[in-house]
Amino acid sequence: MEPINAAIVGPGNIGTDLLAKLERVDSIAVQYVVGVVESDGLERARAKGISASAGGVDWLLEQDPLPEIVFEATSAKAHQLNAPRYHELNIQAVDLTPAHIGPMVCPPVNLTHHIDAPNVSMITCGGQATIPMVHAVSRVSAVPYAEIVASVASRGAGPGTRANIDEFTQTTGQAVSEVGGAARGRAIIILNPMEPPMIMRDTVYCMIDADADRDAISESVHRMVTEVQAYVPGYRLRADPQFDDPKDGWDGHGRVAIFLEVEGNGDYLPKYAGNLDIMTAAAARVGDSIARNRMGVPA
């Protein structure tokens, strides 16, 4: 069966790394790569025999055939303008910006729940790294509040990431609740200027029932790490989950802290850019499921 035609809009760090990952996905054939200025990403696409243009989405939507799936790695504001145009032409969009137009998807949590949606949000890099852990806890104990802190190498944060900091914190905090299963969520991002650059590190704090089964939570966390490692091999715990008994101000709840690190695969981006790598790996996994659904093939 022929693979589904796809396009990448935004040939920056994320878009170019995504292209490398999609080359390993049998259900997808990237036919177009689009930007608004000439770039290394466009040149790399052309070198692979892919139609690439700096003519933007206007150029893309004039092509024949049109792509069936678009992966957008531009900015939240750009995607808000482009998304209605894709929808009008029945092009499914996988949104790697924090625009959050469609339902939010995290592969090990709700990969197939929104497979027919015209637009799916990949949340943020911090969301893809930490929401699996919040979900791992919330499937064992009620989580009235969860907070995530994502620390990424400053050198690995391009202009798109920096321009979207506000959207990052808002969208990630919302997803910690809606997708992760916490009653309330909050997100913080830190751009770490250390040289040489450090790989992505994340801390997840979840309030839990005072009598929650700690062994069951730990087992759930370790099981979830294995699920994420199926598509992000560099995803790992830095230590076993750490538990705290209830303290003043915690309304009788205990707390679990989970410490993560994410090393990139090194496809296009350096290995320290695990924050970007987990986004592209998750998007490739979601795109594969969407493509197989369109083909009528089990994911």
Curated annotation (Swiss-Prot):
Q: Where does NAD(+) bind?
A: G156, A157, G158, P159, G160, T161, R162, A163, N164, N275
Q: What SMART domains does this protein map onto?
A: Semialdhyde_dh
Name the domain of life this protein comes from.
Bacteria
- For this protein, what reaction is catalysed? acetaldehyde + NAD(+) + CoA = acetyl-CoA + NADH + H(+)
The record, for Pfam families, names:
AcetDehyd-dimer (PF09290)
Q: Which GO terms describe its biological process?
A: catabolic process
Q: E.C. number, please?
A: 1.2.1.10
What GO MF annotations does this protein's record show?
Answer: acetaldehyde dehydrogenase (acetylating) activity; NAD binding
- Write out the catalytic residues in the record: C125 (acyl-thioester intermediate)
Alphabetical keyword list: Aromatic hydrocarbons catabolism, NAD, Oxidoreductase, Plasmid
Q: Which family does the record assign?
A: Belongs to the acetaldehyde dehydrogenase family.
User: Mind telling me what this protein is named?
Assistant: Acetaldehyde dehydrogenase 6
